[in-house]
Amino acid sequence: MKASVFYGKDDIRFEEVDKPDISDKEILIQMKACGLCGTDIHKVTEELVPSGSVLGHEYAGEIVAVGKEVSDFSLGDRVTGGIHVPCFTCKQCSRGHYTLCPEFKKTNIHPGGFVEYIKLPEEHVNHLLYKIPDGMSYSEASLAEPVACCIHGQKAVDIYAGDRVLVMGAGPIGLIHSQLLKNKLVKEVVITDVSDHRLNNAHEFGADLTINTGDTNLEMYLQEQGHPGFDVVIIAAGISALLPQAMNVLKRGGTVVCFSPFTVKPVMEIDASMFFHDEKSIVGTYSVSPYEFEEAILAIQNGVINTEALITHEMPLADLGKAIELTQNKTENVLKIVLKNE
């Protein structure tokens, strides 16, 4: 079978790899669509994975082989799912903190998502595989993973109808957050970014106000407008300098949600008095638990997520390198790129 294989930041090869065999409790799917995530791009550009790795985790496909002990799925089923599965028995799992389970990151699909065929191990079949509803395309279904991650992230903080929320970053993740927030009837969603291309799209995804922080001082602008500040700030861009800025525009008692890994200068200074006097807080959020996938699929199915506008490009699986380059150069109106295997 063919796969897009990582050998270096400028070396992605579409080549033959071994097609996985499955056991009696496993499933093989033919990958039909796999979304390109910012995490994939970060791993490629920073060369954080071994040479010969297959990336990709936002997958959807058709079951083409079923182990004889699998009873809940059949040949031809259209499915989507995640990559990490908790044990469900440890202390973290018993408290509902599934993404903190020691076994969580040890589990994965094989060999990755940017490949013609994916093997789903027993734990994925049992806990992290979902049938795609009729009428939902494979490309739409591939959005279930990032939507589920955003749902998980928003559960890390109390968000109420009538709240004012700032989303820092107008990429696909920030725009998904915006739509989920609007579905919660928040009073205001403000989105910041340094790209006019992306900010021009943001109103289509629920933003009430957009601010280009490349040429506008956010704190000064809000003060001049008499803005009361935000109940919640979601950082959806991996830039550590955003964290002090987020803290400064929070209301007293507000919370910053660190959704993205800080890939640029992760060490920073923050005025610690805000934690005591103003009861401001910071929470982190990582990945997704199995239960948020069902919510994500329903959100897509019910039109909470504008999939047609979010997916701006569909490209052949062989063009992964081109897709990464297209996302990075930011000269086009690029939001979500989905790699197709047809």
Residue ranges and their predicted role:
Residues 20-34, 47-91, 133:
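Glycine-rich beta-strand-centered segment in the early N-terminal region that forms part
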Residues 3, 244-248, 290-342:
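C-terminal hydrophobic helical "lid"/dimerization subdomain
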Residues 223, 227, 264-313, 321-322:
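C-terminal substrate-binding/catalytic core of Rossmann-like NAD(P)-dependent dehydrogenases/reductases
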Residues 7, 18-19, 51-57, 74, ...:
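Short Gly/Pro-enriched turn/cap motifs at secondary-structure boundaries
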Residues 157, 205-280:
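Glycine-rich cofactor phosphate-binding loops and adjacent beta1-alpha1 units
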Residues 89-168:
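NAD(P)H dinucleotide-binding glycine-rich loop of Rossmann-like/cofactor-binding domains
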Residues 136-215, 220:
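Mid-domain Rossmann-like dinucleotide-binding core that forms the NAD(H)/NADP(H) cofactor-binding site
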Residues 78, 164, 254-255, 281:
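Short glycine-centered segments of the SAM/dcSAM-binding site in methyltransferase folds
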